[in-house]
């Protein structure tokens, strides 16, 4: 919520969220609940994915690689899929962009990175437009 506020975006502007998404039930459920708490009903219209489904967990490099993926999504209006998404957890009921990339306008996006011990960050990306 703070990343959206500080970026000058509004919650309803967010088109895409790259989650930390490690495919661990406690982590994925907690992140899903956090997204729903911040965005309310808007959460159901946002494309969400886990880049880690394609790259694996890159540990210290994960946040940087995922941020590059988010920037490319904003530049190219395409959201990468969450691959190998076969058995949805009923508690994770958002649009996780399962198995197939989605082409849609991406004006604003967020990239979540969380670490052990409370090292947490969300980066906000806005599409560049000429003034």
Predicted regions and their residues:
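Conserved "HGTGT" condensation-loop signature of ketosynthase/thiolase-family condensing enzymes
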Residues: 1-131
């Amino acid at each position: 919520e703070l990343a959206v506020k500080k970026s000058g975006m509004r919650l309803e502007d967010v088109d895409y969220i790259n989650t930390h998404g490690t495919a661990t039930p406690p982590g994925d459920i907690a992140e899903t609940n956090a997204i729903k708490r911040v965005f309310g009903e808007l959460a159901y219209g946002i494309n969400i994915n886990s880049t880690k489904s394609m790259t694996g967990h890159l540990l210290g490099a994960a946040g940087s690689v995922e941020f590059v993926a988010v920037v490319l999504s904003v530049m190219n209006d395409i959201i990468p899929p969450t691959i190998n998404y076969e058995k949805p957890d009923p508690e994770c009921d958002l649009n996780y962009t399962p198995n197939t990339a989605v082409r849609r306008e991406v004006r604003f996006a967020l990239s979540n990175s969380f670490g052990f011990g409370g090292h947490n960050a969300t980066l906000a990306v806005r599409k560049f437009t000429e003034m």
